[in-house]
Curated annotation (Swiss-Prot):
This is 8-amino-7-oxononanoate synthase. The gene is bioF. Pathway: Cofactor biosynthesis; biotin biosynthesis. Substrate binds at residues 19, 131, 350. It holds the Pfam family Aminotran_1_2. Keywords: Biotin biosynthesis, Pyridoxal phosphate, Transferase. Homodimer. Its EC number is 2.3.1.47. Belongs to the class-II pyridoxal-phosphate-dependent aminotransferase family. BioF subfamily. One of its GO terms (biological process) is biotin biosynthetic process. It is an enzyme of class 2 (transferase). GO terms for molecular function: 8-amino-7-oxononanoate synthase activity; pyridoxal phosphate binding. Its cofactor is pyridoxal 5'-phosphate.
């Protein structure tokens, strides 16, 4: 029987769920050129405005001159260069952990950590709103896999009572589509009380949370005993690319031995690691970036409340505006684009059915005036959706 791909694609179009790739024709930044149109963007994860920072660019260029442009081999053959090792040491210091291990992508870090730690006869428990890479890792591990209610430590506790073997509890730190924080103190307490390990994917918290930018674990004042497995990505607040796992000496050595996505892939370009070293330096040194970002978040939330927008409970740069209907979310996104603003509509299956939204993301590179432009446009466009539904 032939694959009927055309029917699957037609079904997705009919449900207003068809995805398309905008063509970015400029560097990352608040002002971009997309599909030939100059726009003010509020949809990038470049939270600290480092993706196009001149010092980071210069570090990449110098790294390419010194180390070339290719990793050449896997880390376990001859691909683990000095810059890679230096980044791992810097990440261990930033997160307050003995060791860190560099991965090429966040997806690979999550799959590698979960599948190396649990397997048949074990249990993995995950928040129902976790990122797809975490859910895929749980399914691929072969362990008993179950999901607890979102951010609900009581729901987790009831599932832990039925767990078998080594048990890994997995949660996002900042939930990427809602922007809310995992209740790590409560989750860690429940996990430790039942002998389970807690793994946190802090993709959206690293750099934006904590006094030093160490992320959600620093934000809550927790340590390795509370969160034995910490994941972070480098393509968001750090502005470069890649990911890492941070934890104990034994954890990192176990991943080197058993994490297949780490073992069986070519290392990232050493010059990229040089750029990341510079971005980590800026992340820690230029604390004004987090301070300015926090001020923009307050400005947006106060302005959105005055307009009557339905926001999530988010203290982070991720500020979703819940619309509900996918077609209406697309319509609002189009109206904003007609006014020179780029805000992406997020639809199922990325978010639950009936919860389509505009995912506004703020950056330290934005100005207060630019955020006000967005609020003004939303004040003009959002009531038109309400009128259309009346």
């Amino acid at each position: 029987m032939a694959f009927d791909l055309a029917a699957r694609l037609a079904e997705r179009r009919a449900a207003d769920l068809y995805r398309q790739r905008p063509l970015l024709e400029s560097p990352q930044g608040p002002e971009v050129v997309v599909d030939g149109q100059r726009l003010l963007a509020f949809c990038s994860n470049d939270y600290l405005g480092l993706a196009n920072h001149p010092e980071v660019i210069s570090a990449w260029q110098a790294g390419a001159e010194r180390w070339g442009v290719g990793g050449g081999a896997s880390h376990l053959v001859v691909g683990h260069s000095t810059p890679h090792h230096q980044v791992e040491e810097a990440l261990a210091e930033l997160t307050g952990r003995p060791r860190a291990l560099l991965f090429s992508t966040g997806y690979m870090a999550n799959l590698g950590a979960i599948t190396a730690l649990v397997g048949q006869g074990d249990t993995v428990l995950q928040d129902r709103l976790n990122h797809a890479s975490l859910l895929d890792g749980g399914l691929l591990s072969g362990a008993r896999f179950n999901r607890y209610l979102h951010n609900d430590s009581a729901s987790l506790a009831s599932r832990l009572d039925k767990a078998v073997g080594n048990t890994l509890v997995v949660t996002d730190g900042v939930f990427s589509m809602d922007g809310d924080l995992a209740d790590l103190p409560a989750l860690a307490d429940v996990a430790r009380g039942r002998g389970a390990w807690l793994m946190v994917d802090d993709a959206h918290g690293l750099g934006t949370l904590g006094a030093q930018g160490g992320g959600i674990v620093e934000h809550f004042g927790l340590g390795v005993a509370d969160v034995p497995v910490l994941i972070g990505t480098l393509g968001k607040a750090c502005g470069t690319a890649g990911a890492f796992v941070a934890g104990s000496e034994d954890l990192i050595e176990a991943l080197v031995q058993f994490a297949r996505p780490y073992i069986y892939t070519t290392s990232q370009p050493p010059a990229l690691a040089c750029a990341t070293l510079k971005s980590l330096e800026l992340l820690r040194r230029e604390t004004w970036r987090r301070e300015h970002l926090a001020a923009l978040i307050r400005q947006f939330r106060e302005g959105a409340q005055q307009i009557g927008l339905q926001l999530m409970d988010s203290p982070t740069p991720i500020q979703p505006i819940v619309i509900g209907d996918s077609a209406q979310a697309l319509r609002l996104s189009r109206m904003l684009r007609e006014r020179g603003l780029l805000v992406t509509a997020i639809r199922p299956p990325t978010v639950p059915a009936g919860s389509a939204r505009l995912r506004v993301t703020l950056s330290a590179a934005h100005s207060e005036a630019q955020v006000q432009l967005l609020l003004n446009a939303l004040a003009e466009c959002y009531p038109q959706l309400e009128n259309a539904d009346a």
